[in-house]
């Protein structure tokens, strides 16, 4: 009869179908959860390059993608993916970027202090900006700042125009940023003695 186990210990077709349905449901749940997690982040593809490798039978082509992922609230990461197809390279880059997440200290939508980042031949200078200034940055530095959630900043590239160098220089500069509380504790002073009055007013308005 349908749904009953056979005497030899095997299962009927109905039982196997139910088991497969349960497995398929779990896979769908995991897939939906991963899609929800990805939808929470901002992804920007900075550059896609086609690279070739010379082998015995000829040339073997693949693609590389430089991807930036952030939540728009201070978390950002950069990843570099390589695959035989462009979508796979972008996906690998996004996964690596999420593994490289770091937090950017900000006050009222801008960075806490001037900083200069360097990576290879790339040099990027960043300065805090007043509210309403916007993201004054071009090239590959802009998507990094936008994914991090920086709203007002003055940024200028002083070195190489290579997108990979500019992105890594921007990330290096953002990683040098310190919160005002950390600077005050390191110097053994109060927050009012270290932070400028403009930053203190911005923090007070943000907390209010």
Curated annotation (Swiss-Prot):
Gene from which this protein is expressed: rpsE
Record has Cell membrane as a keyword: no
Protein name: Small ribosomal subunit protein uS5
Region (Disordered): 1-38
One annotated GO molecular function: structural constituent of ribosome
Transmembrane intervals: none
Record-linked SUPFAM superfamilies: dsRNA-binding domain-like, Ribosomal protein S5 domain 2-like
Domain called S5 DRBM: residue spans: 41-104
Family: Belongs to the universal ribosomal protein uS5 family.
């Amino acid at each position: 009869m349908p749904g009953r186990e056979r005497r030899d210990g095997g299962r009927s077709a109905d039982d196997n179908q139910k088991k497969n349905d349960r497995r398929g449901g779990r896979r769908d749940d995991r897939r939906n959860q991963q899609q929800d997690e990805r939808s929470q982040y901002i992804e920007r593809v900075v550059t896609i390059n086609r690279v070739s490798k010379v082998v015995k039978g000829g040339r073997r082509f693949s693609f590389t993608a430089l991807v930036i992922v952030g939540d728009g609230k201070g978390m950002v990461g950069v990843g570099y993916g390589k695959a035989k197809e462009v979508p796979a390279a972008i996906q690998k880059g996004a996964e690596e970027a999420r593994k490289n997440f770091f937090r950017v200290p900000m006050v009222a939508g801008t960075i806490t202090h001037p900083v200069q980042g360097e990576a290879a031949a790339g040099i990027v200078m960043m300065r805090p900006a007043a509210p309403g200034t916007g993201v004054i940055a071009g090239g590959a530095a802009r998507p990094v700042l936008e994914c991090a959630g920086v709203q007002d900043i003055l940024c200028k590239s002083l070195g190489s125009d290579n997108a990979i160098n500019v992105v890594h220089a921007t990330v290096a500069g953002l990683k040098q940023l310190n919160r005002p509380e950390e600077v005050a504790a390191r110097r053994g002073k109060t927050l009012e003695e270290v932070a400028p009055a403009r930053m203190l007013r911005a923090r007070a308005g943000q907390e209010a």
